[in-house]
């Protein structure tokens, strides 16, 4: 299935039904009085998080979602039937915002979490509500209220504890398949990974974390080059980033330091907050480096790259160093998870980047398929 992580939809709640102005007409009951019923309420539109869905593809092509109107009231004190609600099932991790106001409506972070997107209109009142001691046969009634109508932006950010960064063919997919049950496509050409992959890493009974692999970045990604810039948003919820570097590239003219520097630069251009996230350096493919050269090559890389943070030396293919890295990640997440989640919730509440400029008249909406 095609991975779609952004969509724009219109939700239209149902209008309330009109109240009825009716008089009781029955044999042997003179001056029966008013008996007009109320109109039914309009149906509302809800979103509900579903962990069994992992893409917004349904909403890329079905852009308008309408709830039913309430029925009008009738005589004999008959109230109109309420309109049926509409429920839209979305992946866990979906952020819903109003395109007109930029308001953050909901962040669906838990399975079965439900939120109202558009409220149905209230039903009108029948004339029986207007009867009084001075007005025994009222003709007044009220119309139903219109339902809410909204243009919404849906943005999926996968819920992962750890995110993988790196150039194409740095070994990210091999690493995630080595430490988890994820089965991403792996090949010896760039951009094998075309969509984010999630894997659950278990380090013991009831001890696990989720790791996200996104398509590799290249220089100029922040301006739209390559594929990775589309998916960097999926790293914004993570607690720590793993920057994988290929220490033994097939092409000897490729400089790992230059590639690593380019990744850091693109990260900073895209989002300063993402750049400030805790980041660990993971030097991969050590099995391809002769043992007598490893120490010198690692030292040379760290010296030229100017890195003073955590460093791990692994081989994703053979599994060397992967277990120690996973235990270190779990320990770090256990210590920092509570503070990270609280700060993330605070940042999301103040995030205004979901607000888009209105599309030009007659023009295509950004992100729509041709």
Swiss-Prot record:
Q: Where is the Obg domain?
A: 1-159
Keywords from UniProt, A to Z, are: Cytoplasm, GTP-binding, Hydrolase, Magnesium, Metal-binding, Nucleotide-binding
What protein name is recorded for this chain?
GTPase Obg
Name its cellular compartments.
Cytoplasm
* Chain residue ranges for the region called Disordered: 128-147
Q: What is its main location?
A: cytoplasm
Coiled coil, from the record: none
Q: Which residues bind Mg(2+)?
A: 173, 193
What CDD domains does this protein's entry cite? Answer: Obg (cd01898)
Pfam families referenced in this protein's UniProt entry, alphabetically: GTP1_OBG, MMR_HSR1
Where is GTP annotated to bind?
A: 166-173, 191-195, 213-216, 284-287, 315-317
Which residues are in the OBG-type G domain? Answer: 160-334
Class in the EC hierarchy, top level: hydrolase
Self-association state and partner proteins as the record states = Monomer.
GO BP terms, alphabetized = ribosome biogenesis
Q: What does UniProt give as GO cellular component?
A: cytoplasm
Identify its protein family. Answer: Belongs to the TRAFAC class OBG-HflX-like GTPase superfamily. OBG GTPase family.
What's the encoding gene here?
A: obg
Cofactor(s) it depends on:
Mg(2+)
| Role description | An essential GTPase which binds GTP, GDP and possibly (p)ppGpp with moderate affinity, with high nucleotide exchange rates and a fairly low GTP hydrolysis rate. Plays a role in control of the cell cycle, stress response, ribosome biogenesis and in those bacteria that undergo differentiation, in morphogenesis control.
PROSITE patterns, per this entry? G_OBG, GTP1_OBG, OBG
**Gene3D superfamilies in the record:** GTP1/OBG domain (2.70.210.12), P-loop containing nucleotide triphosphate hydrolases (3.40.50.300)
Q: EC number(s) on record? A: 3.6.5.-
**In which organism is this protein found?**
Burkholderia cenocepacia (strain HI2424)
What would you give as a GO molecular function for this chain, any one?
magnesium ion binding
């Amino acid at each position: 299935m095609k991975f779609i992580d952004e969509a724009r939809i219109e939700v239209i709640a149902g209008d309330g039904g009109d109240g009825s102005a009716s008089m009781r007409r029955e044999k042997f009951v003179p001056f029966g009085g008013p008996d007009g019923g109320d109109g039914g309420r309009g149906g509302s539109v809800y979103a509900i998080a579903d962990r069994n869905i992992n893409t917004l593809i349904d909403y890329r092509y079905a852009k308008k979602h309408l709830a039913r109107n309430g029925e009008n009231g009738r005589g004999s004190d008959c109230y109109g039937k309420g309109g049926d609600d509409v429920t839209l099932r979305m992946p866990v991790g979906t952020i819903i915002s109003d395109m007109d106001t930029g308001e953050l409506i909901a962040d669906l972070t838990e399975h079965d979490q439900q939120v109202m997107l558009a409220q149905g209109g209230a039903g009108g009142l029948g004339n029986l509500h207007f009867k009084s001691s001075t007005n025994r046969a009222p003709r007044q009634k009220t119309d139903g209220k219109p339902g809410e109508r909204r243009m919404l932006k849906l943005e999926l950010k996968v819920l992962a504890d750890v995110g993988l960064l790196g150039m194409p063919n740095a070994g990210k997919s091999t690493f995630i398949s080595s430490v988890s049950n994820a089965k991403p496509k792996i090949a010896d050409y760039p951009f094998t990974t075309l969509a984010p992959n999630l894997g659950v890493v278990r380090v013991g009974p009831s001890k696990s974390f989720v790791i996200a692999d996104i398509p590799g970045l290249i220089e100029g990604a922040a301006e739209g080059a390559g594929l990775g810039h589309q998916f960097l948003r999926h790293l914004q919820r993570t607690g720590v980033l793993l920057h994988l570097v290929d220490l033994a590239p097939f092409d000897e003219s490729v400089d790992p330091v230059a590639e690593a520097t380019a990744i850091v630069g693109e990260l900073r251009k895209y989002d300063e907050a993402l750049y400030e996230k805790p980041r660990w350096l993971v030097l991969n493919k050590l099995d391809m480096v002769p043992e007598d050269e490893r120490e010198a090559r690692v030292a040379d890389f760290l010296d030229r790259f100017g890195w003073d943070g955590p460093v791990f030396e692994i081989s994703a293919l053979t599994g060397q160093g992967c277990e120690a890295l996973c235990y270190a990640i779990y320990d770090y997440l256990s210590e920092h998870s509570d503070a990270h989640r609280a700060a993330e919730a605070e940042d999301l509440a103040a995030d205004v980047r979901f607000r888009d400029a209105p599309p030009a008249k007659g023009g295509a909406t950004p992100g729509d398929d041709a």
